Amino acid sequence: MRLVPVILVALLAFSPSVLPAQAGAAVKQMAHARVKLAEQVAADSEIRRAVAAKNAERESRQAIERKDQEWASSPAYPLRKALTSSPCAQRLRQLTAADPLVVEAILMDEQGANVCVSRETSDYWQGDEDKWRRPFVEGRAAFVDEPAFDASSATYAVQLSVPVADGARRIGALTLTLKVRKDAAAPGR
């Protein structure tokens, strides 16, 4: 998914009395309040098994790039339906359904390729994006990106990413796209 930067997201999602810096901080706070949810999803045994199975395929970089090009150029590309209707995708939706701010979940393998997605994304390969690099390559426990317009969910959103691990070894990453909303609050509030 490609994000279009939004300079004045505060003007769109928050009251005019809130300064942009304060709004950005509030959005990031809302995302950080969902780190536990993201970690629970990433630790789910079905989710981890799906990532491990995808990694075992040892997909070549050329195959990933070819799939990424076909994914982006063809809305009818069969892999789109396969990755949104798989048991893994159904599990992603089930695990995130209770939080109305989660508009998308993306599960990625050790190369940044989609394992499964809760809804169609704008691209297949996330390996060139911070949502994969920060938790997988850099090993950040949680990464919250800047609020932006998300083309695949057609909403102003912030992305929260965490690693998927097998013991102490990172095997993939999970991103939750959270819609930015004036009344966004921590789960359970």
For each feature predicted by the language model, list its residue ranges.
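Bacterial N-terminal signal peptides
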Residues: 5-15
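Juxtamembrane extracytoplasmic/periplasmic/luminal helical "stalk" adjacent to the first N-terminal
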Residues: 20-77, 101
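Solvent-exposed, extracytoplasmic
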Residues: 25, 29-32, 79-103, 178-189
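Extracytoplasmic/periplasmic sensor domains and loops in membrane signaling proteins
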Residues: 77-92, 120-148
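Short hydrophobic alpha-helical segments used for membrane anchoring or interfacial signaling
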Residues: 104-110
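Conserved beta-strands of PAS-like sensory domains
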Residues: 155-188
